């Protein structure tokens, strides 16, 4: 099988770039234009080609893609351009960006420039900055040639990086990278836009029903005016003050200054949802119900993606996107956490359709983090509880409350569940207190009580604590 290392250079501008748009939006845009492409077949000299779309397509057609692996740095981008714009689909996909995340971690810096510097394999140029806002007709012949040298250098750096990273990289992981990229580049799922349009209409109707009841009280003429007043932090704070309530404040993580604590997970806002004045409770409920929700944004995104891709739904997942090695969401969507319990919100998941003669199997690993942790640490009592099918959450909750807890005690069991899933990974008292208070169904415990619970967990799960210490020593 041949190895083809490739890098596309494409038009971008202030309002049209991968920082403004998702990868899918950028490539599907009418503004999309290839300036040129650098290609290296095996160990042959790297070539640069620039021309019209038809010219580039003819140039790419000379390669035997059916017996070639494609190598890029961010193959999700270049591979999608090949497939969507030039109908080229190689036999196998390789990606040094994915490989670097697995080798160096998600926070190590995965840009080609940083990795080239790390391995001392050469320097990445800066010509791409000078190309901003230039379409192919805007380049002089000398500028285009210089841009070509920049692109060819990127191709050479990518191959050198691959040769280093692949020396001990398992084939099984390369197969996972290939599979992950194919889910995006060569999508097979279809989207049921009719189901999504219906659910989107229901959401909007529900929101306007909420808004209609507040028009007179807030002295607004339209539902849209109510929505804007409640959605704006500044205007919502003003409404609270007009009704004798001081808006809750917090320290901004970005500026360090005081700002309104009106996000749905802010403790100050959560306290307002149970305010003694029912009208304040209603204001908070309507604010939560009328602000653009994750569900609404996702539905609109699914519909627009499907429309641009002839009903198909590319699945963008980031290989080794989390510290644990798990996949992460990408392109402003995460297909790993689509709602599954709420019947109405399940529209998102139900709208993902299998192609003809196939079915979708919906599955999930139950309590996987807690199970693997107990097994890895050798916490045999907890492993045995899982093996027996015991309710591990209720068992620990029973220790906390010193009485038998079952599923008939939803709040207490919620506390036990939160502890089992969080305390095993180092959660402390303050974090536990915040999580219990802000996550539904919610439990308001003092910091001192949370400290007692943390100590109880660590005293009764000594093998897990030892695993932490052993891990620290190895690091």
Map each language-model feature to its residues.
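Amphipathic, charged-and-aliphatic alpha-helical interface segments
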Residues: 407-426
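Conserved catalytic palm subdomain of right-hand nucleotidyl-transferase polymerases, strongest
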Residues: 6, 72-73, 94-97, 352-368, ...
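Conserved "right-hand" nucleotidyltransferase catalytic core of DNA-directed polymerases
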Residues: 1-15, 21, 29-38, 107, ...
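Active-site-proximal helix-loop-helix substrate-binding element of RNase H-like nuclease domains
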Residues: 32-39, 43-57, 63-166, 173, ...
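Cytochrome P450 catalytic domain signature, combining two hallmark sequence patches
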Residues: 90-91, 208, 245-251, 377-388
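Metal-dependent catalytic core segments for phosphate chemistry
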Residues: 22-25, 33-34, 362, 369-402
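Short active-site loop/helix that positions an aromatic residue
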Residues: 76-87, 101-103, 236-244, 366-380, ...
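Short active-site oxyanion
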Residues: 64-70, 226, 357-361
């Amino acid at each position: 099988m041949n190895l083809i290392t490739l890098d596309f250079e494409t038009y971008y501008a202030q309002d049209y770039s991968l920082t403004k748009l998702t990868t899918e939006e950028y490539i599907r845009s009418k503004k999309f234009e290839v300036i040129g492409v650098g290609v290296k077949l095996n160990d042959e000299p790297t070539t640069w080609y620039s021309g019209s779309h038809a010219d580039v397509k003819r140039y790419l057609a000379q390669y035997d893609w059916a017996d070639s692996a494609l190598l890029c740095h961010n193959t999700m981008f270049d591979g999608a351009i090949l497939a969507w714009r030039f109908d080229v689909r190689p036999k196998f996909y390789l990606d040094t960006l994915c490989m670097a995340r697995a080798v160096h971690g998600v926070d190590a810096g995965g840009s080609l420039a940083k990795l080239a510097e790390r391995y001392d394999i050469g320097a990445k140029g800066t010509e791409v900055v000078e190309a901003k806002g230039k379409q192919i007709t805007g380049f002089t012949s000398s500028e285009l040639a210089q841009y070509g040298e920049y692109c060819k250098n990127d191709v050479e750096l990518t191959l050198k990086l691959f040769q280093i990273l692949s020396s001990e990289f398992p084939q099984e992981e390369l197969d996972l990278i290939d599979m992950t990229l194919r889910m995006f580049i060569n999508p097979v799922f279809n989207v049921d836009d009719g189901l999504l349009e219906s659910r989107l209409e229901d959401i909007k109707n529900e929101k306007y029903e909420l808004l209609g009841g507040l028009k007179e009280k807030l002295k607004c003429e339209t539902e849209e005016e109510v929505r804007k007043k409640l959605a704006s932090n500044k205007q919502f704070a003003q409404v609270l003050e007009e009704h004798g309530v001081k808006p809750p404040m917090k320290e901004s993580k970005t500026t360090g200054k005081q700002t309104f604590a009106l996000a749905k997970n802010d403790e100050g806002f959560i306290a307002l949802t149970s305010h003694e004045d029912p009208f304040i409770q209603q204001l908070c409920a309507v604010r939560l119900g009328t602000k653009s929700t994750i569900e609404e944004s996702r539905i609109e995104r699914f519909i627009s993606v499907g429309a641009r891709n002839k009903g198909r739904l590319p699945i963008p997942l980031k290989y080794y996107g989390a510290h644990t090695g798990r996949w992460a969401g990408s392109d402003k969507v995460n297909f790993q956490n689509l709602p599954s319990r709420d019947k109405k919100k399940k529209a998102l998941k139900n709208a993902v359709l299998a192609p003809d003669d196939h079915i979708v199997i919906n599955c999930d690993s139950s309590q996987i983090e807690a199970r693997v942790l107990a097994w890895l640490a050798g916490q045999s009592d907890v492993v045995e509880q899982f093996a027996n099918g015991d309710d591990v959450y209720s068992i620990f909750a029973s220790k906390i409350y010193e009485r038998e807890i079952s599923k008939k005690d939803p709040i207490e069991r919620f506390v036990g569940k939160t502890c089992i899933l969080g305390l095993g990974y180092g959660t402390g008292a303050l974090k536990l207190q915040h999580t219990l208070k802000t996550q539904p169904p919610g439990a308001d415990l003092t910091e001192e009580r949370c400290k007692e619970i943390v100590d109880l967990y660590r005293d009764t799960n000594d093998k897990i604590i030892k695993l932490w210490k052993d891990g620290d020593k190895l690091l």
